[in-house]
UniProtKB/Swiss-Prot annotation:
Pfam families, per the entry: Leu_Phe_trans
NCBIfam families associated with the record: aat
Gene3D superfamilies to which the protein is assigned, alphabetical: Leucyl/phenylalanyl-tRNA-protein transferase, C-terminal domain, Leucyl/phenylalanyl-tRNA-protein transferase, N-terminal domain
GO CC annotation: cytoplasm
Keyword Nuclease set for record: no
EC number: 2.3.2.6
Keyword hit for Amino-acid biosynthesis: no
GO BP terms in the entry: protein catabolic process
Annotated organism of origin: Rhodopseudomonas palustris (strain HaA2)
Classification via InterPro entries: Acyl_CoA_acyltransferase, Leu/Phe-tRNA_Trfase, Leu/Phe-tRNA_Trfase_C, Leu/Phe-tRNA_Trfase_N
Family stated for the protein in its record: Belongs to the L/F-transferase family.
Broad class of where this protein is predominantly found: cytoplasm
Role of this protein: Functions in the N-end rule pathway of protein degradation where it conjugates Leu, Phe and, less efficiently, Met from aminoacyl-tRNAs to the N-termini of proteins containing an N-terminal arginine or lysine.
Record protein name field: Leucyl/phenylalanyl-tRNA--protein transferase
Length: 224
């Protein structure tokens, strides 16, 4: 289900948080289209945190610490990376207004980024919204093989350590399905969301001012 919003200027970060609490999120048709529309899928993508899967090859990459993983160090760099064209994706739903809104959410502590670095360069990452014990994954990107996958592994470890209950991926792709993503009907999703909004989670349960090793991230995931 979608609804058009012709008055995008009226949407504030606070309005956006209320929308997430109701199970809806904004998108744009393209980077050049200033119009936003609200989306509430009939089938919602989630990754059950207790059922997160890491393939053995990826686990070796994570454990090797070939990448350096940080949190909230370069939020604008991550959202710009997500907005840039990538192989198989020539256009983006992240327009200027979307970018401004999520930078605003980041400024008030409700939107976080995970950055993956290689030799000092931003090689990939992801960002998403945190509300209660729910985390809403918005977008990810990579410039080096496995960089976005490594970001997701570190995100899940952080969510598990911080007491989160719901990882919302909005939609399910084959890529996300390999990690255990599933689709749930709208009504079931709303119930899961309501439960997750009742408590408080800590995105900073793991250090945010220094990198967490891949071995530590995998240890946390294995314990759940």
């Amino acid at each position: 289900m979608t609804s058009r919003d012709s008055a995008a200027a009226e949407i504030t970060p606070e309005v956006l948080l209320r929308a997430y609490a109701c199970g809806i999120f904004p998108m744009a048709e393209s980077v050049d289209d200033p119009t936003l529309f609200w989306v509430e899928p009939e089938l919602r993508g989630i990754i059950p945190l207790g059922g997160f899967r890491v393939a053995s090859r990826l686990a070796r990459t994570v454990r090797s610490d070939a990448f350096t993983v940080t949190v909230n160090r370069d939020f604008k760099g991550v959202i710009d990376g997500c907005a840039a064209p990538q192989p198989g994706r020539d256009d983006t739903w992240i327009n200027r207004r979307i970018r401004e809104l999520y930078i605003g959410l980041h400024g008030i502590g409700h939107c976080h980024s995970v950055e993956v670095w290689q030799d000092g360069d931003l090689a990939g990452g992801l960002y998403g919204v945190s509300l209660g014990r729910a985390f809403f994954g918005e977008s990810m990107f990579h410039r080096a093989r496995d960089a976005s996958k490594v970001a997701l592994v570190h995100l899940v470890a952080r969510l598990l350590a911080g007491g989160y209950e719901l990882l919302d991926t909005q939609f399910v792709t084959d890529h996300l399905r390999s990690f255990g993503a599933i689709e749930v009907p709208r009504q079931r999703y709303r119930s899961m969301l309501d439960d997750a909004l009742q408590g408080i989670a800590a995105f900073d349960a793991l250090p945010v001012d220094q990198p967490v090793t891949g071995a530590k991230a995998l240890e946390i995931i294995a314990a759940h």
